Amino acid sequence: MTLSSTTRTATPPPAPDYDEIVNVIQLYIDGFNQADIRKFRQGFHENAWWACTVPDGSLVQHPVEESLEEWVGDGFVKDWEHQILSVTQAGDVASVVLEMHSAAEGPATGWVDIHALLRIDGVWKDMNKTATHVSRAGWAATAGA
């Protein structure tokens, strides 16, 4: 059986607000590396959520606000390196695909995130972070190598 579709795939133009969108992602990275809860709160919407699949495929999910103390705590990695793999914007909505890993531990222990952002009252806010361990990330797993 052959399936046909009238759906077309369009290549999006460059994101007009690329710098502003990437700045939100930089706040996310800086929040970890500088253990600065204010940076997280500046970048994430107050009702943002995160979800991820860990190496065994299990799902973990929480409101971002409930995770901030752990993220800035002494036991959390503080040497994240990252690479933005894509930025797509359609008006007031944007997505960023991000590869990140510990400099000390290397790319094999990293994560691939998709961040969903909204422009609210002229300000970009990260509404949702969905991630997977690089061992489950397909082509994006080698981006940081």
Where does each model-flagged region fall?
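Short secondary-structure capping/turn micro-motifs that flank functional sites
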Residues: A48-W49, S135
